[in-house]
Swiss-Prot record:
GO molecular function: ATP binding; ATP hydrolysis activity; ATP-dependent DNA damage sensor activity; damaged DNA binding; single-stranded DNA binding
Pfam families: RecA, RecA_C
Gene that this sequence comes from: recA
Biological process terms in GO annotation: DNA recombination; DNA repair; SOS response
The family this protein is said to belong to: Belongs to the RecA family.
Listed transmembrane segments: none
Organism encoding this protein: Shewanella sp. (strain MR-4)
Main location: cytoplasm
Compartmental location: Cytoplasm
UniProt-recorded name of the protein: Protein RecA
GO cellular component assignments: cytosol
Keyword DNA repair among UniProt keywords: yes
Amino acid sequence: MKVDPNKEKALAAVLSQIEKQFGKGSIMKLGEDRSMDVETISTGSLSLDVALGAGGLPMGRIVEIYGPESSGKTTLTLEVIAAAQREGKTCAFIDAEHALDPIYAKKLGVDIDNLLCSQPDTGEQALEICDALTRSGAVDVIIVDSVAALTPKAEIEGEIGDSHMGLAARMMSQAMRKLAGNLKQSNTLLIFINQIRMKIGVMFGNPETTTGGNALKFYASVRLDIRRTGAIKEGDEVVGNETRVKVVKNKVAAPFKQAEFQILYGQGINRTGELVDLGVAHKLIEKAGAWYSYKGDKIGQGRANAGKYLTENPAIAAEIDKTLRELLLSNPAALSSSASDDENSEGNVDFETGEVF
């Protein structure tokens, strides 16, 4: 198809102007696999790191993770903290829900002795603490759990039944304007956990929305929709969840990709199981019947035993992880091609919110 050279020139000029004004990566072609050269922190899941395009969550940005109850939101953020601490980074957890379990966090690999934790009384206090930590330049990762629990001071001091229309949204809007610039300067990753609410009277499209108004949706560089898709059983006992995460917004790489992994109760993300699955899909690990082999050596009969072998041999697991990252991050499309046809449908996009449903 012939393209008008004047239009092509005008498009190049406006794209250059937009990127100059709003930053590199603020606009790109949907089919581009280009990712920005940004520092990232692993999410704890290889497939999610690949789906994000840059190899993890970007530093100096705002990230929103939302989903239904018990879908793995807090577990995912604790995995991010554990990964950051392994790199020697300082992390803080703003526990607005007053529900953080330090024993569970420790099981996921979080160094609780060096994790800063705050349980603020009001939403304003929580956001001021975030801003102070950000401006200090000494904290690398801040988690806020959750936006729905950031209650404005006026609402706390008022009575139950009082109307406070738009108060939380105004508070979040003001905080986002203040935080966004400081985060970039200090290279701090700020992750907000959010809950889902239903819009009343929606006949068509996605009735789901998130709390706290629209400011967070706008300022977030990455938005992740996390869902529990099934149960993992050992006999009759449920031992974990099958989890799917959709990247519904991404300003550092192409959006709308998705990742699937397992979250095991008391253990977190099943990394070795993920390595086995992706290794087989990309022919790094050979599978003959029920036996799995790596470089000609048998590593286990059945997926669980192969995963156990990798857990007991971290050097081999790290080697497979490194090879898969190099392969998949250079060609992110390979991740989706390894999924089964029924799990790889394109889905529908709500262009008002950027959500896939």
